[in-house]
Amino acid sequence: MTKFEIECVESTTDGARDHYSKFCLEPLEQGQGVTLGNALRRTLLSDLEGTAIVAVRIAGVSHEFSTIPGIREDVLEILLNLKEVVLKSQTKNPSVGRLRVQGPAIVTTSNLELPSEVELIDPNQYIATICGNNILEMEFRIETGKGYHLIERSIDETSIDFLQVDAIFMPVKKVNYLTKDIRSNDNLLQEQLLLEVWTNGSIDPQDAVSQGGKILTELLHPLKEINFKSDEEDTVAEDSKINQILIEELQLSVRAYNCLKRAQIHSVADLLDYSQEDLIEIKNFGQKSAEEVIDALQKRLGINLPKEKTVKPN
């Protein structure tokens, strides 16, 4: 199998929340470019963890359609601005942040009071404008997660007055890939994979690709040493379980049960040593009891005893 190399061929930063890199992976065998590119793209967009504000409690506000005296934005606009705040956390545990600003002032993310384990990526993100001497005061919950979480209801019933926010956990904003045919030194037709990654600044594209590759490797690793049970092994195991079933579980009549016990027949395995004719010859058993046992074995376990008499070993 061809061993490929990866190289970062381009990297740019357009502000704190817009990082871009292009990677070249080569050489790959024909068809591997699409397989690897698609797997990496889906992993980068859905499986990398990020941090976001998930709920907000604003002083004097009971629902998202409220307005706040002296604040230019309504509550819904403020929630949308908080949704865009990019954070980076050193822990997976939920935490709480706060904000209290007295106007007149333009409120940005630099005014947020964050726990020591949470890092703010862009201190210039706009939140709201306060007119006059009014005060904007809020408390917000911060969590770590994956993907994009839509709110199920506007009010978080687990915490009084908290309004939920559609959380964007994805640190990777966009991924593109392109495959190209190339020729090796031996003139063999191979592939080149070009991978473009855009992130929100909470992670470098290089680190994102590295994490994505690690996730894929760990996901596929069990397939290297996979052991499938043969049908024969499954059949033997199933037969062994059935043989261990006691005759009590067949729910026989008292007469049939006592006769079997006196004949030292305690389990299904013991019954399988008998034919239908053998059962009839058990002392005090009779045709009716034999039919009861035969019917119970067939209906409950799918077992059919042979009709003809067996020869017992001495």
Swiss-Prot record:
The keyword Hydrolase does not apply. This is DNA-directed RNA polymerase subunit alpha. It is found in: Plastid, Chloroplast. Its EC number is 2.7.7.6. Residues 241-314 are annotated as: Alpha C-terminal domain (alpha-CTD). Keywords: Chloroplast, DNA-directed RNA polymerase, Nucleotidyltransferase, Plastid, Transcription, Transferase. DNA-dependent RNA polymerase catalyzes the transcription of DNA into RNA using the four ribonucleoside triphosphates as substrates. One of its GO terms (biological process) is DNA-templated transcription. Belongs to the RNA polymerase alpha chain family. The gene is rpoA. It comes from Rhodomonas salina (Cryptomonas salina). Its main location: plastid. One of its GO terms (cellular component) is mitochondrion. It catalyses: RNA(n) + a ribonucleoside 5'-triphosphate = RNA(n+1) + diphosphate. Residues 1-227 are annotated as: Alpha N-terminal domain (alpha-NTD). It comes from the Eukaryota. It holds the Pfam family RNA_pol_L. In plastids the minimal PEP RNA polymerase catalytic core is composed of four subunits: alpha, beta, beta', and beta''. When a (nuclear-encoded) sigma factor is associated with the core the holoenzyme is formed, which can initiate transcription. InterPro entries: DNA-dir_RNA_pol_insert, DNA-dir_RNA_pol_RpoA/D/Rpb3, DNA-dir_RpoA, RBP11-like, RNAP_asu_C, RNApol_insert_sf. GO terms for molecular function: DNA binding; DNA-directed RNA polymerase activity; protein dimerization activity. The keyword Secreted does not apply. The N-terminal domain is essential for RNAP assembly and basal transcription, whereas the C-terminal domain is involved in interaction with transcriptional regulators and with upstream promoter elements. It is an enzyme of class 2 (transferase).
